Amino acid sequence: MNLIPSAPPMADYLRLRADSGLSPRTAAQAEGALANSWRWCHAMVDGEVVAMGRILGDGGWYFHIADMATLPAFQGRGIGRAILEWLLAEIRTHAPEDPYITLMADEPGRPLYRRLGFVETAPRSLGMWLPG
């Protein structure tokens, strides 16, 4: 496995989202995501993009982990963990002191996030979204 500190190609981004169970996105949505994230990391195995993750953030204090996705055939091999550890190291290296790091955790990813120190915010706060 090789970690690549950049965004995956658009076709791979769209495929990873769909094949890993994340909601599908359009090419126009992918274009914005690929161009405007604070940091990206993707993993390749035998020339295939098999996992990815990115950070949204202001570079000051707020950072949000997004698009953590691993193809089902490659889950359970530590690839997602390696990507998340790389992303967190980028924040710790380049952000000012005491960054605020968030993510939205679907059920399959929660054990990984807990192992790396993330805690649920409920009942103090709950994630919300605006359907649209």
Give residue ranges: language-model regions.
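Conserved beta-strand in the GNAT
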Residues: 42, 48-57, 61-64, 69
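A conserved beta-turn-beta hairpin within the catalytic core of GNAT-like acetyltransferases
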Residues: 57-65, 75, 97, 123
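A short helix-loop-beta-strand connector motif used in the catalytic cores of GNAT acetyltransferases and
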Residues: 32-42, 97-99
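Short amphipathic alpha-helix that is part of the acyltransferase structural core
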Residues: 1-28
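Conserved acetyl-CoA-binding loop of GNAT-fold acetyltransferases
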Residues: 114-124
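Conserved acetyl-CoA pyrophosphate-binding loop and the N-cap/start of the following alpha-helix
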Residues: 74, 78-86
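Conserved GNAT acetyl-CoA-binding A-motif
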Residues: 91-105
